[in-house]
Amino acid sequence: MGDYTEHDRERMVVEGAKTAGLGSPDTEFTAGHRTQFARDRARVLHSAALRRLADKTQVMGPRDGDTPRTRLTHSIEVAQIGRSIADGLGCDPDLVDLAGLAHDIGHPPYGHNGEKALDAFADPYGGFEGNAQNLRILTRLEPKVLAPDGTSAGLNLTRAALDAAIKYPWGRTGPGTKFGAYDIDADRLAWIRKGAPDRVRSLECQIMDWSDDVAYSVHDVEDGVIAGRIDLRALADPQEQAALAAMGHRQHPELGVDELIAAAQRLSELPVVADAFRYDGTFASSVALKRLTSELVGRFATAAITATRAVAGPAPLVRYQASLGIPPIVAAEVAILKTVALRYVMSDPVHKQRQAAQRERIQAVATGLLATAPRHLDPQLLPWWVEADSDTARVRVIVDQIASYTESRLERVAAQLAG
């Protein structure tokens, strides 16, 4: 157990040796110092698509306060948490790290709110799903490698890397469902999934997904506390516990209301949580809040390692050799923390009003770009527009354009189109 194969390390396009070095193409740096998965991680790390996440909303907007988390900082945190779990289970840490960096790389401006707006615009033409856009960016849209026929292979990552980065390794099955590939990218998905069990995610992908949940639940609550939107004492209040549990059950129907109430109570009784009840922005309370986030991340990551080892044993685990174990009480704790952010930040009337304006802006830009295309399209997307032979293909180009925008650029284009 624990070995990656040549099949895992295969790339869609065979690449030649680098030629610009001062030594021979077979120098130690090229041939020995970097694994294929380390190269994959570097490609994601240096991509323009990753940098653009700095101006895309996580929960609080990129311009809300001095230190809000963005999609970029969130992705970096997911990568770090995932790397820690990978170290504990024997997966290649670079593989899980890059999956964390790439897991939101296809998200449009305004986060999940922008995703809803683009999905509504593109619904008759295959819809929009951030996870499917991840695959499209990694295998087509991010410029790095061309196939011999001149078509783009995107970053040309290894099979195992792409498989680790796809949360939902299947196509669209119906409205409102999560999926990892548009019909137009079915060939890419088939190549990635060659030899993989149907609808089963690799262990590296499961680690990335759990790390995403952990980062979301802990760090987004931290941002809400700092912004004055979340009071952690709600976790100890019976009335708020009941309200949170009811909302959490709607979001996570596999978890019962009583389980979620117990999770809130259990968290409220942890000394690190109680110490952060009275956050007021002072240095001491900031230390308490940071200790809370650190200890909760460790609690949730360690629980997954321990539960997985209890079933799979002590040997290094890779790919499809094991499933990640999540203890039910820990799953409930993460779910209740995610619900705290949902109830006190995302359900706020002012926040919802701003979200409505964001969706209208995306709809207006999408309609305007389609009506004036190809005038406002980026040069990189012009070949796709020229080759588009159907409304579905043309709408996909418009969606690719908007999904690539930062929030600042979207707002500039909206003003430009409005005249």
From Swiss-Prot:
Coiled coil: none annotated. Residues 71-192 form the HD domain. GO terms for biological process: dGTP catabolic process. Pfam families: HD (PF01966), HD_assoc (PF13286). Keywords: Hydrolase. One of its GO terms (molecular function) is dGTPase activity. Belongs to the dGTPase family. Type 2 subfamily. This is Deoxyguanosinetriphosphate triphosphohydrolase-like protein. It comes from Nocardia farcinica (strain IFM 10152).
